[in-house]
């Protein structure tokens, strides 16, 4: 139906991770796709290389000829392209609604949760690929093995992230869903009510048909709390032997995790098998268990699961290793980049770094994301930031918010200093961070560059500076 009525699809804010992936898949399905964005980035360059028209900036003329206009939550109603589309009676729809349309073409597998969505979606796509199922995927980060965050496969499944930040995951109608965990984040969306947050995830699970299946992580307290209200078929996973799929004998082997998977899921052969996951961290064992559950449900073999996890090449900005960088005083430091910006994610990633490189001094460069999050989770940030060996804090990435008194990086630095363990270094401008880090780092260190904002540009700048040494 959509193919008969829609030819030209225009994306406002096409360079965003969620938007660019959907645009690429639609282009590969044969639609004429265009888009606009204020900033040029790797995603807009990639889309341009595919033949997609990407306009710099936003003007009303860009929507001329469009059958539908797709927007992300970052795009304001006053955007000239949105205004022009509405004046011309061109439908303006959120990104999630277009993702829901894509799920009409395939059987959808939607991965939700406060943390771990991107990694779990990527692991699921990797295993399904190893099983020869050739899935379509739309991921919030670049799947390193594919070199992109989206791909149109020939198989029957589409694997996609389901975004709870604006409750837009309630547009999706998957046949299978995953909830990796539930945490108190993006609470403005839910009126600062845990009950409303819980209900949104219950409603998301209930978007499946009666023959669908959800995979729910019982290591999450909030997930356990919603289980009695879930009326659609589900299986549980976790590190507890009461789960339908659980892991034991978890072992850190360098930057990999080795563990035994036990399956006691209804309708499946009971038993256990060993796997090696090609990424560090106990939290990633949980992400792998979710992907294993989905894979077993679609009929993937144990061999395909083992192959997909061992051959996993990671995701952009999820414990992404850049290798050793040269230091001005001699020696080298290992550079790792990560998107983590919530204290729970950060604690898991820092623990993974300690487990993978126990002998190294851990240096963290961190850019908080949003003043509201810094304010709401101030104590949690202080605790997790105090666990590293050296800390460089750059100013909060506002993401469109106005500054909030005592919810900035200077306040965090003061609070950490009072604890008496660390002397945080404050870097007001993120552009100065690469040079500052080179002066802080010592031979043999691991430096973790972390945050969801403009700090993502630091690794490239650091590598460039390092080459000049």
From Swiss-Prot:
Major place of residence: cytoplasm
Record carries keyword Cytoplasm: yes
Location within or outside the cell: Cytoplasm
Binding site for ATP: 113-119
Transmembrane domains' residue ranges: none
Gene Ontology molecular function terms on file: ATP binding; UDP-N-acetylmuramate-L-alanine ligase activity
Pathway: Cell wall biogenesis; peptidoglycan biosynthesis
Entry EC number(s): 6.3.2.8
Gene Ontology terms: cellular component: cytoplasm
Keyword Ribosomal protein found: no
GO biological process annotation, one example: cell wall organization
Keyword terms of this UniProt record: ATP-binding, Cell cycle, Cell division, Cell shape, Cell wall biogenesis/degradation, Cytoplasm, Ligase, Nucleotide-binding, Peptidoglycan synthesis
Reactions it catalyzes: UDP-N-acetyl-alpha-D-muramate + L-alanine + ATP = UDP-N-acetyl-alpha-D-muramoyl-L-alanine + ADP + phosphate + H(+)
Family per record: Belongs to the MurCDEF family.
Protein function: Cell wall formation.
Protein name: UDP-N-acetylmuramate--L-alanine ligase
């Amino acid at each position: 139906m959509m193919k008969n009525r829609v030819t030209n699809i225009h994306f406002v804010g096409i360079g965003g991770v969620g938007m660019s992936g959907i645009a690429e898949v639609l282009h590969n399905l044969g639609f004429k796709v265009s888009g606009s964005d204020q900033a040029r980035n790797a995603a807009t360059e990639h889309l341009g290389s595919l033949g997609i028209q990407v306009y710099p900036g936003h003007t009303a003329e860009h929507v001329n000829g469009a059958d539908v206009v797709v927007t992300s939550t970052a795009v304001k109603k006053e955007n000239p392209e949105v205004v022009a589309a509405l004046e011309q009676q061109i439908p303006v729809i959120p990104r999630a609604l277009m993702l829901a349309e894509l799920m009409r073409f395939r059987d959808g597998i939607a991965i939700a949760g406060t943390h771990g969505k991107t990694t779990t979606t990527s692991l699921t796509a990797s295993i399904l690929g190893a099983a020869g199922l050739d899935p379509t995927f739309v991921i919030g980060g670049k799947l390193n093995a594919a070199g992109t965050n989206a791909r149109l496969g020939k198989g029957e499944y589409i694997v996609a992230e389901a975004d709870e930040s604006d409750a837009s995951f309630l547009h999706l109608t998957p046949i299978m869903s995953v909830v990796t965990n539930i945490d108190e984040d993006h609470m403005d969306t839910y009126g600062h009510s845990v009950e409303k947050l819980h209900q949104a995830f219950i409603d998301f699970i209930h978007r499946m048909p009666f023959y669908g299946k959800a995979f729910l992580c019982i290591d999450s307290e909030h997930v356990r709390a919603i289980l009695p209200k879930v009326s659609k078929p589900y299986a549980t996973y976790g590190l507890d032997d009461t789960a339908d799929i659980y892991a034991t004998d978890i072992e850190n082997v360098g930057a990999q995790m080795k563990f035994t998977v036990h399956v006691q899921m209804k309708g499946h052969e009971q038993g256990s098998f060993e796997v090696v996951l090609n990424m560090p961290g106990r939290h990633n064992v949980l992400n792998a268990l979710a992907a294993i559950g989905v894979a077993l449900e679609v009929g993937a073999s144990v061999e395909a699961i083992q192959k997909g996890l061992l051959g996993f090449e990671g995701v952009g900005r999820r414990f992404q290793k850049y290798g050793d960088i040269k230091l001005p005083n001699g020696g080298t430091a290992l550079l790792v980049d990560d998107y983590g910006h919530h204290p729970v994610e950060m604690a898991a990633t820092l623990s993974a770094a300690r487990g993978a490189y126990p002998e190294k001094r851990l240096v963290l460069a961190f850019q908080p994301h949003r003043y509201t999050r810094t304010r709401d989770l101030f104590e949690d940030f202080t605790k997790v930031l105090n666990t590293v060996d050296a800390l460089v804090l750059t100013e909060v990435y506002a993401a469109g918010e106005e500054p909030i008194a005592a919810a900035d990086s200077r306040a965090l630095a003061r609070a950490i200093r009072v604890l008496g363990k660390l002397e945080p270094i404050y870097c007001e401008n993120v552009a100065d961070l690469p040079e500052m880090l080179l002066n802080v780092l010592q031979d043999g260190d691991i430096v973790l560059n972390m945050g969801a904002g403009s700090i993502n540009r630091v690794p490239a700048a650091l590598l460039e500076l390092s080459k000049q040494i």
